[in-house]
Amino acid sequence: MKKTLLATAIVGALGASAAAQAATVYDQDGTKLDVYGRIAMGVAGGGPEYDSNGNFQDNGEEFVDVFSRLGFRMSQEVTSDLTAFGRLEWRFTGDENDTDGGFNEIRQSYIGLQSKQYGTFQAGNFDSFYNQFVSLPFDVYIDRGLEFAGHRKQSRGDSIGYYTPDLQGFTAFLQLKHYSVRGESAPNAEGTVIAPQGGVRYQQGPFTVG
């Protein structure tokens, strides 16, 4: 496993944090559009390693991209309590002149409805609610493989989810990901599968448990 020696975010007008450093492009009559992103690069090394087949690899130092991204957030107030929203985010290779696959992943693409009274429902391609409510507050280094095992199995594409409004510090969430065999010439033995995920998070000031 490569050891990350240095990971320095190079911050422009869009800022380093997608959540806190979004730039508002349009905000009028209940309609809002934000753009956000980051260019993050580091230096990785670690000497001799072995691949999954046990073959020797001499891994010297190199510049690496550390999850650079660019995205948009959209929202429209439907009523005083109901807001429709959407998000679209790409990952790109920030450390190379990659003209063919620079934007190499659609990381987020979803739409939803948010109510202060009834909670939030969304559908599409998004991070697991476990990751959003439990893992992220603890700043887990997912590039080192330290993440909930079901993150991609229960989210990221063909997913729907719901989480409650804040209930005196408690937030409950439920998420479902649909696996379909539609169009496959040789369906797998499991057939169509729905992978569920749920939990409860309690947060009070800097204290979080979930």
Name each model feature, range by range.
Residues 1-23:
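Gram-negative bacterial Sec-dependent N-terminal signal peptides
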Residues 46-50:
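Cytochrome P450 core scaffold surrounding the K-helix E-X-X-R motif
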Residues 186, 193, 197-210:
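Conserved acidic, metal-coordinating active-site core of Asp-based
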